[in-house]
A protein has these predicted regions:
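Structural detector for short beta-strands of small beta-barrel domains
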Residues: 1-12, 44
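OB/S1-fold single-stranded nucleic-acid-binding modules
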Residues: 2, 40-41, 62-65
Length: 65
């Protein structure tokens, strides 16, 4: 299921950040390897969630133009 969110934090040096799901309000971990393009804090994005051993993780992260 595709979700809508906003990037609340992204650290380009470390290659990860967090996305706030606009519907549930939940904060989801996002790694640069799962982004179609590099995001910045404040970007609106679409994404999907997969469960990893560390909890939910955003995949297929795409900026909404």
């Amino acid at each position: 299921k595709t979700r809508r969110g906003k990037v609340t934090m992204f650290n380009p040096d470390k290659g990860f950040g967090f996305i706030r799901d606009l519907d549930s309000g939940e904060s989801i971990f996002a790694h640069v390897t799962n982004m179609k393009e590099q995001v910045e804090q404040g970007d609106k994005v679409t994404f999907e969630v997969e469960q990893s051993h560390k909890g939910p993780s955003a995949i297929k992260v795409t900026i909404v133009k």
